[in-house]
């Protein structure tokens, strides 16, 4: 966490509140927020919006071998959704492990993404009843980030467009718990030559690696600004210089494939983006 924040600050970016590279803030660690997540899960249970699911990971993987729907994968078919209280108690007595899933309503969720425009989707289209807490007690991403956003009063969420299918799920949790729903902006991804999303296997393109190799942070920002349509050419630039030129509507919707020219610009001429 500290190294990540240090890399972000090296890029010339800063933030208004929260931990810093010099000072941690335990309230921002999800591992310290389990009591809050537990209370919110209990609230969903009391509203009959959460139910125990006894399906194993193997069961879910088998279900996922069915034809996928969109980017969210195969929907969970609700195998345990309508178990009677007696059936639930019997399975618990038998020692079967269970997770907790959100009971998805049939109604569509609508929101306007600041980049991709109006969106409408049912939770079934986004994977069906989703996990809130795993059988080992770990809270799911969907519950944790929704509660964090609501509890901290987050008004704008900016992230990669691969998380667009998660948005209706998070809106459902936020609304069920009485939280305000933030604005969402999903941005296109950087891809390698094989059109795969940049990931851990591209370690040489991590901020830490680029920084260690002596790449100028202003060149990184300049490349990203050009890709995002904020500037009309690659040129070194400080983030502060881009603030007045930034417009959500100028952002492209298509992912960007990094090229050899981009590597040359960053001073990484001998690297293949694959």
Question: For each of these PLM feature ranges, what is it?
Answer:
Residues 57-200, 206-211, 260-274:
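Active-site cores that bind ATP or allylic diphosphates and position pyrophosphate for catalysis
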